[in-house]
Amino acid sequence: MAKFELYAEVDVSISGHQYPIIICRNGLIDPDLINRFITSKQVLIVTNRTVAPLYLGHLQSVLPSKQCDVVILEDGEEHKNQRSLFTIYDSLIQNKHHRDTSIIALGGGVIGDMAGFAASTYQRGVRFIQLPTTLLAQVDASVGGKTAINHPAGKNMIGSFYQPQAVIIDLNTLKTLPEREFRAGIAEMIKYALLVGGSFFERIQEVLQQGLTVHSPELPLLIAECCQVKAKIVEQDERESGLRALLNLGHTFAHALETYTDYKKWLHGEAVAIGLYCAAVLSEKKGLLDKPIVDQVEKMLIHAGLPHKIPNSIDLIQLRELMSLDKKIKNNCLRFVMIKKPGACYIDDSVTEDCLHNTLINVVEGEQK
């Protein structure tokens, strides 16, 4: 059996609940590691049709003494809905899972969101372990305890805050990740670079210029740093009453774009990439961000192989209406994360309709800034 290899461990402490984020190789097939967090006799593994053929058997093999049930869902954001959620509930109930059961999320952000929400609500809460298999889930979605399903009216409209027992990031799972999915995860890394600034921003710029791949030696520690950044923010503000809202940089635009296209045109990270560029242009329009930094953001997204412009087929008026459904609205004001410079971001609820519309026009494909 391949030997367990530890790169880093990030400790998270939220509201008295402590858990580790373990960045490693061969963690998925290490019985000591998995059973350290699965103390229950019953386990439900939630995964999807893409991941199951690759890793489900490996995970089941380290849980031979457990009642190990499995739910295999359709893959994709468009399936993060009530029907999929009730498929999880149905399996838990039909297989007589008790309150001391454990749910394992084996997959990307969609699986983590749904399995986590099921764990937070089944019998008022059961143990939950994240095994993220995409870069986006490893650096962002699996960290911080946000769980949700989508509603036809908007993304993540129904959800909860619920922390896992552990997050086990086995980097070997990235070897089978499609190139497009890997690049989508880089968008969240660029987001962290903009939030943190300083040497981290410069380092992300540098590795993107060189060409970041799944084989890049810098990748394990970059993932660990992203997890550390998010963990520190979430520890201070679990329920997004202030500081944590900064993690939504670019997401007001991104969620509206995803809803507009019924989650079928872009991966979440690709929509975030466009949202980051929109946020940079909006910050420039407000006189906050220097044009050279906007150009740097654009180059980072291009180096990452990510989209950054809004297709000219999108109805901008309808897009703005979808933004008005955003969960981040407070006192009827749409709130955007603005960038003064990398490492200096803040929440702004004074963006006018004209300023927002001018920003959207400027980021449409074929338009000049």
UniProtKB/Swiss-Prot annotation:
Reaction(s) catalysed by this chain's protein: 7-phospho-2-dehydro-3-deoxy-D-arabino-heptonate = 3-dehydroquinate + phosphate
An example Gene Ontology CC term for this record: cytoplasm
UniProt keyword DNA-binding, yes or no: no
Cofactor(s) listed in the protein's UniProt record: Co(2+); Zn(2+); NAD(+)
Pathway given in the UniProt record: Metabolic intermediate biosynthesis; chorismate biosynthesis; chorismate from D-erythrose 4-phosphate and phosphoenolpyruvate: step 2/7
NCBIfam families: aroB (TIGR01357)
Name of the protein: 3-dehydroquinate synthase
Organism name: Legionella pneumophila (strain Paris)
Record lineage: Bacteria, Pseudomonadati, Pseudomonadota, Gammaproteobacteria, Legionellales
